[in-house]
Amino acid sequence: VLRGTRHINRLGRPPRNGDTLNKDMEDYLFTNLLDSISNKFMAQTSDELCRRMDVTREQADAFAALSHQRTEESIRTGTWSEEIVSIQVDGKTIGPKDEDHFVPGTTRQSLSNLRTHFGPDSLVTAGNASGIVDGAAAVVVKSLDRAKSDGDEPLARIVSWGIVGLEPAIMAYGPVPSSKLALDRAGASIDGVSRWEINEAFAGQAVACMKDLGIDQSIV
């Protein structure tokens, strides 16, 4: 079982959670979201990539609006209802809960009214970037023989993967070289992929990666 947890509220002791006696106060914007090598926040590495790739605020907002609209539609149709589970906390059942970060009715126009947060030439706003939230996910990985013996029908097959290091100032560019490496190892091409996931925090970053890879946002 492979599982991952994002419990950001418990990383450090951020001021928004309230202060307690004899405890240090930490701002996780600096303790967790700042790259010490380039001295840039994660959002700023996205902005740097967007400048190099000529990605505009309008393009970032357009893709963010599409993401919000896709989320709204998936909730309406129950697309992911079978993959969202309730959890027990202190004897109480919590969830399943709809995605709590998107805003129903979001449009490119409504996003364009939001201010940027990392300087006058930044593309990042509260509407075209991921929120700082908690979450967890898990997946079961088995050999094909074990899946057959257990009577399980595989949903997917792991063919290859790629891990690539790059200039810290453009950390946001990572999906491009890592995807190319994974495809090369699999003997596949970009054109041969019918569905992509660029699981990143900033819409501008995703647009830049799609632009460099030459893929259409309709399959991302």
Give residue ranges: language-model regions:
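Beta-strand segments within the central parallel beta-sheet cores of soluble alpha/beta enzyme folds
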Residues: 1, 61-66, 84-89, 152-163, ...
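Flexible glycine-/small-residue-enriched beta->alpha junction loops
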Residues: 1-48
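Active-site pocket-shaping loop/turn-to-helix segments
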Residues: 33-41, 51-54, 58-65, 122-138, ...
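Glycine/charged-rich beta-loop-alpha catalytic/anionic-binding loops adjacent to active sites
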Residues: 24-30, 116-125, 157-164, 218-220
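Short glycine/threonine-rich loop-to-helix capping motif typified by GTGT followed
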Residues: 96-101, 168-175, 200-218
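Phosphate/pyrophosphate-binding loops at sites that engage ATP/ADP/AMP, CoA/4′-phosphopantetheine
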Residues: 49-54, 147-154, 180-195, 210-216
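N-terminal extracellular/periplasmic Venus flytrap/periplasmic-binding protein-like
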Residues: 59-149, 212-219
